[in-house]
Design a protein with these regions (language model features):
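Compositionally biased linear targeting/interaction segments
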Residues: 1-133
Length: 133
């Protein structure tokens, strides 16, 4: 049997806006987009990591910062203008679907609540799914 570095769970989500957040997508997820191979995906990650090369630090330069829109970001990663225009249709600059976990305790009774929410705007955050453990 063939071995794969990732599974479907690492690449797809059943609840989303239908676009990939270019600022948080993994190397493997980026490669699902037309014209983005492993080298270009690695370049996208390098670009968004900022000067220190570490993601999640103060010097990160995500798409959308300092006037760098998705098209310009993709062009900086080595895509032609035509390739960038096609690939850009699959990307967004922010995440819109989140999992929220809350642990509650009332009179020594504990329960964990989990919700999937969609962030349409700061004031429009519908609950898409809700359950408890």
């Amino acid at each position: 049997p063939l071995g794969y570095p990732v599974g479907l769970m690492d690449l797809f989500t059943p609840v989303s806006s239908g676009k990939i957040n270019i600022n948080t997508a993994s190397l493997m997820v980026l490669q699902m987009v037309p014209f983005i191979d492993e080298n270009r995906a690695a370049q996208i990650i390098t670009l968004r990591s900022g000067y220190d090369g570490q993601e999640g630090t103060d010097d990160d330069t995500p798409a959308g910062s300092q006037g760098m829109n998705v098209l310009a970001f993709l062009a900086s990663a080595g895509l032609s203008q035509q390739e960038a225009a096609v690939a850009a249709r699959y990307f967004d600059q922010r995440s819109r679907t989140f999992e929220v976990t809350v642990e509650a305790e009332v009179n020594s009774y504990k329960r964990t609540f989990i919700a999937i929410v969609g962030r349409n705007s700061p004031r429009d955050v519908p609950v898409l799914s809700f359950y408890w453990r």
